[in-house]
Amino acid sequence: SRHTEIRRDDVEKVPELRVLTSSNESGVHIIADKTNRQFFVTGHSEYDRFTLKNEYFRDVEKGLKIDVPKHYFPYDDPSQPPHFIWRCHANLMFSNWLNYCVYQETPYDLNDLAPLNK
């Protein structure tokens, strides 16, 4: 994710898509099609506390030029144990998606489900 970027302007050029969440600092986070049948999530909400730390130090040890992940280590200091503040948000996002975009929109008889391709 740190080596790629999805530009909001590019997404907004596609009439079938809409940006659901984004920020000035981290960019586009969640994109959905207008039917709410397809979702695209950037970032790694599934990461545990130390995954990003392990990736960061792996790349540092390889001598790669890499920035310290913002807001991950206290005071952006890699010698400190990382924060772990996203788990509840990640679980809530998944639960809400499952409830509101899958269960509420899925017919009881799956034969009634419209195909994705028109």
Name every feature range the model reports, one short phrase each:
Residues 1-51, 117:
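Pocket-forming structural segment of enzyme catalytic cores
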Residues 45-118:
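Acyltransferase
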